[in-house]
Amino acid sequence: YTSIDKTVYRISNVPTDNVSVVDSCLLILHDWSSAINLADKEIDKERGVIREEWRSRNSGMQRIMTNALPVMYPDSKYADCMPIGSLDVINNFPYQDIRDYYAKWYRPDLQGIMIVGDINVDEMEAKLKKVFADVKAPVNPAERIYYPVADNQEPQIFIGTDKEIETPSISFFFKSEAFPDSLKNTINYYGIQYMISMGVTMLNSRLAEIRQQANPPFTGASAGYGDFFVAKTKSAFGVDASSKIDGIELAMKTILEETERARRFGFTETEYDRARANYLQRVESAYNEREKMKNDTYVNEYISNFLDNEPMPGIEYEYAMMNQLAPNIPVAAINQVMQQLITDNNQVVLLAGPEKEGVKYPTKEEIAALLKQMKSFDLKPYEDKVSNEPLLKEEPKGGKIVSEKAGDIYGTTKLVLSNGVKVYIKTTDYKACLLYTSPSP
């Protein structure tokens, strides 16, 4: 796949006990990296493939995003950076242009190879060195530039409509400086990422609670943190919502109110206790399942390390570290981080909605005014309604198993209880924890 600033080639499900297949895959990787022929006829065939890919991706939201980029990234390379780009270019670029591009950017100092599987590491390393020995580093290579994203004092707002979009949505971004790659392999980075994760988790819990109301102000809402849209040289805290056709104004005001409530008053001890416990439980689960981790999990971790310098100390280290770190980070520290993430400047807004007669959307001026009003919203601190009452006042009388049938489905044992509930039990060694689900028709 190709995205804004990376291309990843992947070969999966290779039978490692078949030497000839493994060797063929290494040759394929070699040719992708430096030896693609780029014959005129093959280039023309690929133009057709890319045209079809463009057509399949040319959705209403894709068109809105393409039009939004110049507003979100004014005077920037990111303003026009969709991977496929212009069909006019795809149809008409000279053959030599793609050959020059390939020679310029497909080179060993910008490439990494990740191989994960049931292999002999020393043998695989020797094969790699032999297969890739003829791939030479270029003389005076072009500089790999990471383009910065400018700050903005006034909100950058884009409003787009399209006939293919069915429901309105709005996204607010609060930009911040990206964490330096050179400092990511530190305890400090883990602590900051943990605190951001906790803040996002608790805000999402509040939004989910609102969604459960009888007549919620939005059909969906969420908060998040990561790269600013398509640029990894800037980070952003974001909050977004979707709504009914006539409800985007209420939706956007509600999510901004909850964002401001989190900034102004922070989160409660009880909210944090739950979020931290769930986080540590997930870490423990990953630790317990470490011997059964899938290859893709390792590969994705290695890709993040190679491209973004994300640390990869291993789950054993992370499990021990986070069980020491998390209990010693108070909720006050989380609240302070939220105040830093939700800024009065560096705000970007993307509103997308159906192009329909009679449907009205807030103007850029109205959205900007609402953002400026955030600090004056009439809000009260969030009240975490935690009950100390037992789940059941009285322990119910137990039923009984009325029938038991072995080998019913996939080697399970089927139990039928006296209240009609059907229970399927299967003992496996796939997971180190108990898995339970309770669906109903």
Where is each model-derived feature located?
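Structured mid-domain segments that build the active-site/substrate or prosthetic-cofactor binding neighborhood
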Residues: F172, E177, Y189-T268
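Acidic/histidine-enriched alpha-helical segments
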Residues: K6, N37-R55, N120, V139-Q153, ...
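Conserved small/polar residues in nucleotide/adenosyl-binding loops
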Residues: Y436-P441
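C-terminal regions of mature proteins
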Residues: M114-G117, D273-L417, V423-Y424
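Scaffold signal of the M16-like zinc-metallopeptidase fold and its non-catalytic homologs
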Residues: I4, V21, C25-I28, W32, ...
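Active-site-adjacent, His/Asp/Glu-enriched structural segments that form or flank metal-binding
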Residues: Y1-Q62, N92, Q96-L110, N120-E123, ...
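Extracytoplasmic
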Residues: I4-K6, P108-L110, T167-S169, K234-A236, ...
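An aromatic/glycine/proline-enriched structural segment found at the starts
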Residues: D75, G112-P168, A277, Q281-A286, ...
